[in-house]
C-alpha cells in the first residue's frame, strides 16, 4: 500500500514539473517574440531591440516562475490542473448535425 502511495505522489510531482516546464517554455518563447515585435516596431538601434527581447523573455520566465511556485506550494494534489489548458465545451458543426 505504501509503494502505491509513494508512486502516486511521485507521478504527481512529475506531472507538476512537466506542466511547469511546458508553461515556462511557452511563456519564454511568446514573450520573447512579443519583445522582438515591439523592438522592431519602436526601436532602431540593435542594442535596444535586443534589450526589448530580453525584457520580454524576463517577463515570460518571471510569470511562469510565479505560477509554478503557486502550484508547488498548493496543498491539494489537483493543483497540476491549474496549468492545464482549459477544456472547450463547444461542439463542432459536424457533431451538432449528428445530434
UniProtKB/Swiss-Prot annotation:
| Cross-referenced Pfam families | DUF543 (PF04418)
Subcellular location(s) of the protein: Mitochondrion inner membrane
Membrane-topology descriptor:
Multi-pass membrane protein
- Give me the segments passing through the membrane: 27-43, 50-66
Q: InterPro entries, alphabetically?
A: Mic10
State a GO cellular component annotated for this protein: MICOS complex
Q: What are the record keywords, sorted?
A: Membrane, Mitochondrion, Mitochondrion inner membrane, Transmembrane, Transmembrane helix
Q: What is its main location?
A: mitochondrion
Subunit field text: Component of the mitochondrial contact site and cristae organizing system (MICOS) complex. The MICOS complex associates with mitochondrial outer membrane proteins. Present in a large lipid-enriched complex called mitochondrial transmembrane lipoprotein (MTL) complex made of proteins located in the two mitochondrial membranes, including the TOM complex and the core components of the MICOS complex and containing at least digalactosyldiacylglycerol (DGDG).
What does this chain do? Component of the MICOS complex, a large protein complex of the mitochondrial inner membrane that plays crucial roles in the maintenance of crista junctions, inner membrane architecture, and formation of contact sites to the outer membrane.
To which protein family does this belong?
A: Belongs to the MICOS complex subunit Mic10 family.
Q: What is this protein called?
A: MICOS complex subunit MIC10
What is the taxonomic lineage of the source species? Eukaryota, Viridiplantae, Streptophyta, Embryophyta, Tracheophyta
